[in-house]
Regions:
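Short histidine-centered beta-strand/loop micro-motifs
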Residues: 20-23, 33, 41-46, 87-89, ...
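Short beta-strand His + acidic residue motifs that chelate non-heme Fe in jelly-roll/DSBH
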Residues: 41-43, 61-62, 78, 84-90
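Ligand-binding loop in jelly-roll beta-barrel domains
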Residues: 80-106
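Short, conserved beta-strand element in jelly-roll/cupin
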Residues: 34-36, 45-61, 99
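A generic "binding-loop/recognition-motif" signal
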Residues: 28, 37, 47, 66, ...
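A short, N-terminal "cap"/entry segment at the start of jelly-roll beta-barrel domains
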Residues: 1-27, 111-123
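Short, charged/polar surface micro-motifs in flexible loops or helix N-caps
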Residues: 26-28, 37-39, 58-60, 67, ...
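Short acidic-glycine-tyrosine-enriched beta hairpin
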Residues: 66-80
Length: 123
């Protein structure tokens, strides 16, 4: 697979889909997300590690019941097996990119809405 070199912050800011996979290789995956105001990602736990970088908006991170605030430039690392959720608390969508290691979503995954993502859940 060729190297990936793009402005990830611009890609995340421009993304309007709830979830959009943009890169998957053998050991990692990059996914863009846009969470509408008042909505959340949905409580979940993965079998893989997850790193989230917040690009714009404001929100709340909930990891194993512990709550903290997130905003542009926040980084949250979610170890495999950690129960987590992220809530968009501002007036604009919470925009972020996330890195899974190893990959979590199928290559080419696009979920335009949270409902679409929930219908496709595999965990």
């Amino acid at each position: 697979m060729p190297a990936f070199n793009q402005d990830i912050f611009a890609l995340a800011e421009e993304n309007t889909f709830f979830r959009k996979e943009i890169l998957t290789n053998e050991h990692s995956q990059v996914v863009l997300m846009s969470v509408e105001p008042g909505d959340d990602i949905g409580e979940e736990a993965h079998d893989v590690d997850q790193l989230l970088v917040f690009v714009s908006g404001t929100g709340e991170a909930i990891l194993n019941g512990e709550r903290s605030q997130v905003k542009a430039h926040s980084l949250v690392v979610v170890p495999a097996g950690t129960l987590h959720n992220f809530v968009s608390t501002g007036a604009t969508p919470l925009k972020l990119f996330t890195v899974y290691s190893p990959p979590e979503e199928a290559p080419g995954t696009i979920h335009k809405t949270k409902a679409e993502a929930a219908a496709a859940e595999h965990h």
